[in-house]
Amino acid sequence: KQETAETTNVTQGQDVGVPNPYEIVDTLEEASKIAGFNLSVPATYGDYKKQVIQAIEDDMIEVIYFNDTDNEGLRIRKAIGTDDISGDYNEYKDVETVKVGDVEVTEKGSDGDIAVVIWNDGTYSYAIDAGEAKLNSEAIANLIANIK
């Protein structure tokens, strides 16, 4: 009987849920005030012309790009520290570290499509997660050059 009671308590505890740490804002300037650092990213990416900008206090800024039918193209993240902040824990067939300009990045994907790119500059971590957008090495290089 004691085991049953513990199981019930755990289930009830999980139903409460964790509050979403992200605060949705209108501009990168607002996001930088929340996160405590700046992020600059391209205004659009291909057909993905709508942005949702969100921030976690003293931690992270995330920009999600959507197309006209609200399909997610990709998301770009920047956070304090040097950890992998992609949020993507899938196993990929292709994982390689490449040099893009002066930056060493790790690209993960399969069959020529890059799904995740992560890098850090010693102070901040960055991540690009592809949704429906197709990313190749050239697209990644252009994005990285425009993410600060």
Range-by-range predicted roles:
Residues 122, 127-148:
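Surface-exposed amphipathic alpha-helical segments
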